[in-house]
Amino acid sequence: MQILCHLSQLIEKSAEVYGEKIALSYRDYDREQWMGISWNLFARRVDQSARSLVALGIGVQDNVAVFSQNKPESLFVEFGSFRNRAVIVPFYATTAGAQVQYMVNDANIRVIFVGEQQQYDTTWSVMSLCHSLEHIVIFDPKVKRHPSDNISMSFDEFLRLGINEPRYQAEVQRRVNDAQGTDIANILYTSGTTGQSKGVILLHSQYNHALEAHTKILKITPDDVVINFLPFSHVFEGAWAKLCLSCGAQLAINLRPLDIQRSMREVQPTCMSAVPRFWEKVYQGVLEKMESGSAIQRNLIKDALKVGAEMWEKYTSKGKQAPLGLRLKYAAYDKTLLRVLRKTLGLTRPNIFPVAGATISPEVERFVHAAGFPMVAGYGLTETCATVSFDHPDKPVSLGSIGRPLPGVEVKIAGEDNEILV
């Protein structure tokens, strides 16, 4: 069941349905284990964040920056901001100081949330040049602050600002009640063809349409475990995360990109969005593994992938039934060699694997499907709240295609350059 509502109410309404079910999980690097956050706790942290933002003087449609790696706190702040009708402006965790300075001043940001030492140091280095910036809130308690820093606070200190203040809670509820689809949800800075980055405005109504339209095609359920690999600051991952949360799925938040393969084996996700480069590395790793094996092993794996590719490209992707001999051969490989391959990657329960952001080569796309990963290739823009088109699992799919338009989206190919108009 998908919960469709203004994003200011999504986590609250989801907690009413799912309660103590795990909504978010993350690796605790001190304990070396994955920790869970229930929907109830998620909703409490969102509400605490909303009240504390009021305490800091954040008003309706004020801009709040999040400069961090993927963390649960990023989502607490984002949805807490939505409850205030405030706007989240996410920065990539690797953003340089000059760009941070530009975006803070351009968006008139008063509060910035930083993830770890690198983001804190970068922000502090340009603090004197950011004339609107009043507060730095630090997610990681291990961050060492500058000796002269008297404006930053830890995330725990931030959360305590709104405790036992009924007036803050009343103000948050008033803003939730007044929330409109025309409210700005995000400003996403993207590199322009010339000059400084441009801030793309996304409205709550755009998200609401996108979330509803996707679930007409994709089947995401509360049983899904979705690992977050791409940064939330990217429209692809940010919109995908909101879609999965609206369907009650669990988000397994991967902090460090280099840990992704380890995280996949530990979490055993059913879904993950990625760029083609991720699958290219997986494919290259399989090829290298094949070359290090015996001739018999190489030939068996090659044949398994060949059979899997034929099964998908000629039959499954076209909605056709394969000949009995091919079906039996594929079933044998699927239960043995291909199953081992999926287990090695930590993807034994595959459901949906969206891929976008660049062109994926036919060779890699063929491999992904041959191995049994239901990849959904697509195309999108920041301005369109990510998706323009993607492969519809219930419709015929062609190798190299970027699928069919999202319901409600109109596309036109125009001019001598075959420009895509949306």
Task: Write out the residue ranges for each language-model feature.
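Conserved structural elements of the adenylate-forming
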Residues: 43-48, 200-221, 229, 339
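Conserved pre-ATP/AMP-binding loop-to-beta segment of ANL
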Residues: 19-22, 138, 153, 160-189, ...
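Conserved AMP-binding/adenylate-forming
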Residues: 329, 333-422
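Structural core segment of the AMP-binding/adenylate-forming
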Residues: 10, 56, 83-161
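Conserved AMP-binding A3 loop
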Residues: 36-40, 177, 185-211
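Conserved ATP-dependent adenylate/AMP-binding module captured primarily in the ANL superfamily
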Residues: 95-128, 210-227, 257-271, 344
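Conserved AMP-binding/adenylate-forming core of the ANL superfamily
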Residues: 24-79, 96-101, 154-159, 204-205
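Conserved AMP-binding/adenylation subdomain of ANL enzymes
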Residues: 208-225, 232-335, 349
